[in-house]
Amino acid sequence: MASKSFLSLLVALFVAICFVLSPGVDAAKGPVITNKVYFDIEHGGKPLGRIVMGLYGKTVPKTAENFRALATGKNSDGEDLGYGYEGSSFHRIIKNFMIQGGDFTKGDGTGGKSIYGSKFPDENFKLKHTGPGVLSMANAGRDTNGSQFFICTVKTAWLDNRHVVFGHVLEGMDVVYAMENVKTSRGDKPVEPITIAASGELPIEHEVDEQGNQVPFRIEL
């Protein structure tokens, strides 16, 4: 009887150690942010502020790279794309829902393109629309991702498994909320244009653990 109790204790201890050492424990704190990009926003030609976004390149590498490249105007080799988000506008604003942009070809929500061609498939739906600041791909149905995206201003759970979440706002939610509250006209279009005056990539400053190893940059969702 005593031996069985001792064996059960050993098994429980082993499971506990495995749980602590498991990478899934860190994953519970949130997905790894691999890149940081920014938009400098103007409203009616006047500076509104900067939005800094973290991209989840480990979870959705293809989608994150598409956004990073379009934000910088350069591919992974540093070569100019000749197109991207800089100079484009947010064409759709819905209060208590989201702000949408990324159509740099037509500017009205009917255009845009990805770095992989016109459209690319949904990568996965592992990440959810958990609340304000979530960065997700706009689409016209299954596997129709291009360059259009939206930033949530509330939790939008009904979009889970329909739109690919690939990032989160790290700084500048005050700018997002200011954008959310501008006056709009028919079709939810801002009366005065909201434009991305400048965009690019920022370095990630990693923390270092006691062994001198870089700690993955995450945010808790």
UniProtKB/Swiss-Prot annotation:
Known glycosylation sites: 145
Function: PPIases accelerate the folding of proteins. It catalyzes the cis-trans isomerization of proline imidic peptide bonds in oligopeptides.
InterPro entries per UniProt: Cyclophilin-like_dom_sf, Cyclophilin-type_PPIase_CS, Cyclophilin-type_PPIase_dom
Motif (Prevents secretion from ER): 218-221
Protein origin, superkingdom: Eukaryota
Similarity comment: family membership: Belongs to the cyclophilin-type PPIase family. PPIase B subfamily.
Pfam families linked: Pro_isomerase
Cellular component terms (Gene Ontology): cytoplasm; endoplasmic reticulum; endoplasmic reticulum lumen
First-tier enzyme category under EC: isomerase
Subcellular localization, as worded in the UniProt entry: Endoplasmic reticulum lumen
Lineage: Eukaryota, Fungi, Dikarya, Basidiomycota, Agaricomycotina
Enzymatic reactions: [protein]-peptidylproline (omega=180) = [protein]-peptidylproline (omega=0)
GO BP: any one term: protein folding
Annotated signal peptide: 1-27
EC number: 5.2.1.8
A GO molecular function held by the record: cyclosporin A binding
PPIase cyclophilin-type domain sequence ranges: 38-201
Keywords: Endoplasmic reticulum, Glycoprotein, Isomerase, Rotamase, Signal
Summary of activators and inhibitors of this protein: Inhibited by cyclosporin A (CsA).
Protein's UniProt name: Peptidyl-prolyl cis-trans isomerase B
Gene (UniProt): CPR2
